[in-house]
């Protein structure tokens, strides 16, 4: 009887997908075209983008994340509360690998254009975006979390110009826009992670 119950429980649990979780203590850094290795948009994994970094941060178009092999699953989508964006593991990060081997989780997040090199201005922006401290992410997140830059009718209503309305409507909330726009206001280090 016990073996029948155990077999039933094991079979039932095998049908479940992974549950949402909020692992913490992640070191967070940023990278882009000028400091990628080699410089440019090439990434090590192909998760449907043709080996090119990118993403707006929605669930359907997550921003590229680099990390250590085995830290997260290749092509895994996570939610980044400190950015209010979804990210997908698509690239390798040498410093992340060194940190991971010492027990420190570390993710490196793509900041911008896949077609334009932002040069030193982009590297300076990445340094300003890096919040310091340690943060939680959401693994196996729901698809309906809020995303920085999605259309918000209240914000659009309050917008003072047509340009602001257009930016709100198109969901433009990049971290870096060449040649030198750094959007440090798109980082929310106090946002909690939750399932």
Cite the ranges covered by each PLM segment.
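Fungal secretory targeting signals
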Residues: 1-19
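Secreted/periplasmic proteins
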Residues: 15-195
């Amino acid at each position: 009887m016990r073996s029948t119950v155990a077999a039933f429980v094991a079979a039932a649990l095998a049908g479940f997908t992974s549950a949402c979780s909020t692992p913490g203590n992640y070191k967070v850094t940023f990278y882009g075209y000028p400091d990628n290795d080699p410089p440019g948009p090439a990434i090590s994994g192909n998760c449907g983008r043709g080996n090119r970094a990118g993403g707006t941060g929605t669930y359907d178009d997550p921003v590229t994340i680099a990390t250590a092999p085995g830290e997260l699953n290749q092509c895994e989508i996570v939610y980044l509360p400190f950015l209010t964006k979804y990210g997908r593991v698509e690239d390798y990060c040498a410093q992340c690998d060194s940190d991971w081997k010492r027990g420190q989780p570390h993710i490196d997040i793509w900041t911008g254009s896949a077609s334009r090199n932002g040069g030193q201005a982009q590297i300076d922006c990445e340094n300003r975006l890096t919040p310091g401290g340690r943060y939680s992410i959401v693994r196996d997140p729901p698809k309906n979390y809020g995303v920085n830059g999605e259309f918000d009718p209240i914000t659009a209503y309050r917008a003072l110009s047509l340009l602001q309305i257009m930016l709100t409507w198109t969901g433009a909330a990049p971290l870096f826009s060449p040649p030198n726009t750094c959007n440090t206001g798109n980082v929310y280090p106090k946002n909690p992670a939750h399932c």
